[in-house]
């Protein structure tokens, strides 16, 4: 069940922007261990804050599309290898002004589920690769 829930989260919420689906798939509070796009460390966030994060991400990359490349589950944890594609058109999501360039980013995402909802998340995006694609010297 959790692989399906995590895959659905990427498809419906991140790719299609159906934020109401997060009500079913995300707990009222989650612990997110991934660094935020601005470099701040992981944090506890409410479901509404999670939705705001997705909204901001989609504003910066309006044609954002995720493809789940691989999935595995052990107990209450699910691992996904995903590829995100889109165009850097919006709000300077990556700490630099928008470039209008296409991006493709590989991400390893791990989530812990309880009662069918995500309660904890770890994400490892290839941010260096994205910055290089956008022409930034790092």
State what each model feature region is.
Residues 1-138:
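C-terminal and inter-domain tail/linker signature
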């Amino acid at each position: 069940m959790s692989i399906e829930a995590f895959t659905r989260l990427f498809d419906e919420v991140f790719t299609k922007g159906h934020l109401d689906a997060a009500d079913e798939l995300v707990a009222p509070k989650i612990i997110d261990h991934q660094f935020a796009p601005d470099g701040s460390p992981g944090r506890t966030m409410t479901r509404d804050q999670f939705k705001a994060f997705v909204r901001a991400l989609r504003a910066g990359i309006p044609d954002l599309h995720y493809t789940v490349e691989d999935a595995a589950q052990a107990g209450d944890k699910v691992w996904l290898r995903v590829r995100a594609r889109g165009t850097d058109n919006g709000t300077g999501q990556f700490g630099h002004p928008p470039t209008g360039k296409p991006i493709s980013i590989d991400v390893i995402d791990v989530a812990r589920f309880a009662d069918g909802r995500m309660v904890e998340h770890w994400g490892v995006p290839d941010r260096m690769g994205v910055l290089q694609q956008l022409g930034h010297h790092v």
